[in-house]
Amino acid sequence: MKGKSIYKSLVGLMFFGALQAFTSCSDEPDAENYYTFTGEMVSDYLDNRPEQFSDFTKVLQRSGLYGMMATYGTYTCLAPTNEAMAQYLKERGFSSVEELTKEECDTLSWNHIIAETYFTTDLSDGKIPTANMNERFLTFSCDSDAVEGGNVMYYVNMASKLVVRDDSVENGVVHTLNRVIQPSSAYLPELLLEDKNISLFTSALTLTGLNDSLYEYIDNTYYCDPDSVNKGIPFHRTGAEYRMYYPANRMKRFTALVETNKVFAEAGIHNLDDLKAYAKDVYDKMYPEDAGLYDEDWTNRKNPLNRFIAYHLLPYYGAINDFTISESGIDYKTTCAMPNLIDCTDWYTTMMPGTVMKMSSPSEGLFINRKGVASRFSVRGTKVYTPTEMKTIHDQDLAEAGLPVDTLNQQALNGIYHYIDNVLTYNEETRDVVFNDRIRWNVVTMS
């Protein structure tokens, strides 16, 4: 009897609970169950500071991105101030945002929004890992500002200073800029020509005709089925289904590793004739079977100067933090089997036929064709300067040469270029000493 009594009580409780659950279902929850949202979205952050961002807010509204900035997600908003927008408009002969076309507002908006959240603590000197919504990568760099008492200042594309940074909002982060971001629309050869600090290199690039190879951007031979782009291809892993999406377009991009005029001068190379002689001395030794056969045929791939320039060019995009595993944000100790015995290294083909270059990243920075570990090297190699170092060198060298110091932009529409600290060649030491090594190739760089 006792068991039946307990059973009836349990059934009664279950029925009462079900009844309560049924009767409590309502379109309007009790007041104490309301969630009151108090945080700011990106859109709120901008709206609540009209004295700073009213012009940029108008641009976002006209482009249609304003609504996205009011939704949940993970965004980085690089917001130019009203003063920055006024300067941008003045440079184009406009007096207000209303004079911009819809297309111009689209481009402005896309250039300043990244669909991922990046605080300055997440970034290092080099490329911001995710492209902006205009599918352009931006450069992040830092420098000390004497006017600000030596405090570290952060820049996007070497020109737009983060005057306020790391303001967290519910759907990302906002950084305030003192200048509108203007990614270059120039192709890589055109951007190189703008830099007066590398005029000797660009003269040789033009003479060899290799500049013509750097104008490619979109591969018109590429085709991918729309379903593979939009719906993806299913695959299974660890019991779960995933989808792999193919790119709609295949883009062609390039990297140039460039000596400044000062680096050439320190090696005794002061003009184009000096550079021709230097290249001939190196490559006649490397290719004795071709010595003297193509000396005046500058566009021939076996010409010494042509070989010299081609070895400075890579047929893909490489920011300084792209080249080795340790530079890609992956933990150094987990990616190198014995980090005390080997630097993180990768190998890349160049645009000089039949050649590669070795990229290593000891703590001193990124080096080309280095032999050894950390400071224990037998061949130092050639250092690739960071964006911060590059801007400093650019400004100092132009000032020393009595030339106007203009704005530096290393990112072209279809590529990027870096300053290097020594004359780069594929010489006998590189072939016989540096490349006398076990080649460990990161398969990602082969795609």
Model-derived regions, located:
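Mature, structured domains of secreted/extracytosolic soluble proteins
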Residues: 22-447
